[in-house]
């Protein structure tokens, strides 16, 4: 009897150990920090990572959204950073929910390159919440398009997924007419040349003459892609082009 009990206890211990091991092996991990994700509430990212995303707060450049020095006294309605004062941009206003680093960078990377499309919903809703002033008064949001070859390779356009979470209509008013090198592989000086003449309007843009629209994308680095899109839209008659992105590389 004692031997039978010992064997039974040993079998139970082995089973419990196996269950524990399986739970560790197969339990989902946070896409941003790899912590065990036992109770996911906002996609495959833990709540700690979501709450660690620090918003970009004023004072911000009204044109590109870069942080301005906190000591600067702004006495004019349009507060622009030195770069935006030197450069003629087609984008009227741009905002991002946070800097492209830490958990936010990991979340965007997981969405964009690892195919974690379920992240688009919570990330898009965070954009909608923190970018409410960009959406107010706009006729629609326009996702930055991928070239058909890249969309076919990736299987989706993350900008379209994010745009669907906005509280106003999504209009596909742009198309990418030329395949371009990935912007992440290029130095800042070449990014504007890389996307020059890469976009064209679709028939849907005809209904947007005189309107205010908001471009939606995942990341803004130098703003070259957003600016190229804005120029095409304004040439087609759009009055004001804003941009809302999930993240921004600050100081580029």
Language model features with spans:
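Conserved PRPP/pyrophosphate-binding segment of the phosphoribosyltransferase/PRPP-pathway fold
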Residues: 66-67, 71, 76-215, 222-252
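N-terminal juxtadomain amphipathic helix
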Residues: 2-101
């Amino acid at each position: 009897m004692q031997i039978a009990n010992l064997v039974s206890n040993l079998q139970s211990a082995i089973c419990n150990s196996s269950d524990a091991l399986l739970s560790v092996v197969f339990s989902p991990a946070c896409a941003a920090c790899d912590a065990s994700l036992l109770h996911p509430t906002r996609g495959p990212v833990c709540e700690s990572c979501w709450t660690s995303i620090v918003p970009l707060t004023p004072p911000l450049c009204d044109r590109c959204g870069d942080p301005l020095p906190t000591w600067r006294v702004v006495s004019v309605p349009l507060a622009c950073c030195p770069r935006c004062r030197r450069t003629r941009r087609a984008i009227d206003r741009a905002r991002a929910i946070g800097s492209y680093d830490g958990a936010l960078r990991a979340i965007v990377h997981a969405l964009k390159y690892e195919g974690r499309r379920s992240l688009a919903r919570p990330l898009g809703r965070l954009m909608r919440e923190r970018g409410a002033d960009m959406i107010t008064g706009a006729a629609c949001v326009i996702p930055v398009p991928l070239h058909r070859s890249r969309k076919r390779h990736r299987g989706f356009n993350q900008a379209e997924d994010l745009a669907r979470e906005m509280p106003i209509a999504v209009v596909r008013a742009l198309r990418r007419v030329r395949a371009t090198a990935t912007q992440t592989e290029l130095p800042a000086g070449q990014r504007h040349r890389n996307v020059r003449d890469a976009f064209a309007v679709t028939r849907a843009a005809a209904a947007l003459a005189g309107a205010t629209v908001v471009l939606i994308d995942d990341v803004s680095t130098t703003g070259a892609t957003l600016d190229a899109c804005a120029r095409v839209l304004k040439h087609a008659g759009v009055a004001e082009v804003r941009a809302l992105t999930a993240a921004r590389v600050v100081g580029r």
